[in-house]
Design a protein with these regions (language model features):
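Bacterial carbohydrate/catabolite-sensing allosteric modules
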Residues: 1-44, 50-225
Length: 225
């Protein structure tokens, strides 16, 4: 079979794992796998990055037997919609990773359930009652599912998600760093802080911990990724 894969290089660790899986599958099944990887900057909207995303247009959809679509790596709304339309119009089989999309097969985790388990652990094992949350890009599927899980479990347990400590980043290091600097300033100003912070991914959580290291906030706020 001849398979096309579409991805944006926004998350090195996630993509490396996916590439290793593709490599192993190719060795086992001897399929021809073509990777279309764009490196456009998320949310930029400028002409340079729009041209980067136009790279996906080079794929001749009729030349392939099927597609692999790690949709959560493609977060530019118009780019994502255009690519989806081309995949669906081709009438070729396609597997979506991490996001359930009508008409496509799906492989992924239950994003909401995983976040509910994090809340349950923090509350049950560590006695946390107030939470902050740093999420991914607000309009994306996985961010919505993760927030749904956090909010529903907190409500169920009668706990508090502090609205002033719910922020949206882009899963990159700087998002966690920015959130941490905001919290350091609030702590120094004597403002109320959550007892724990839930991060939507490990990189933002690591950035948070690294940023508060050596400050008065170090060791005072547990964070999960």
């Amino acid at each position: 079979m001849k398979i096309a894969v579409f991805a944006t290089g926004w998350n090195g660790e996630y993509l490396r794992d996916m590439y290793h899986g593709l490599e192993n599958s190719q060795k086992e099944f001897h399929d021809s796998i073509h990777l279309y990887a764009s490196f456009g900057r998320l949310g930029s909207g400028d002409s340079f990055n729009k041209s980067e995303f136009d790279f996906f247009e080079l794929a001749d959809m009729e030349a392939y037997d099927g597609f692999l679509y790690p949709s959560t790596t493609i977060k530019e709304g118009d780019v994502k919609q255009r690519l989806l339309e081309r995949i669906i119009e081709s009438k070729k089989p396609c597997v979506s990773l991490e996001e359930e999309i009508p008409g496509l097969s799906f492989v992924g985790i239950n994003q909401s359930k995983a976040m509910r388990q994090i809340v349950r652990h923090l509350a049950g094992v560590h006695g946390i009652r107030t939470f902050g949350f740093i999420n991914g890009m607000k309009d994306t599927y996985e961010a919505q599912m993760r927030q749904q899980g956090v909010e529903s479990k907190i409500r169920e347990l009668g706990l508090c998600l502090m609205p002033e400590w719910v922020d949206y980043g882009n899963y990159e290091y700087r998002s966690g760093e920015t959130y941490a600097r905001k919290m350091i300033a609030a702590y120094e100003a004597g403002e109320e802080l959550p007892q724990a912070v839930i991060s939507a991914n490990d990189l933002m959580a690591a950035a948070f911990l690294q940023t508060i290291k050596g400050t008065a906030l170090e060791g005072k706020i547990p964070v999960t990724g």
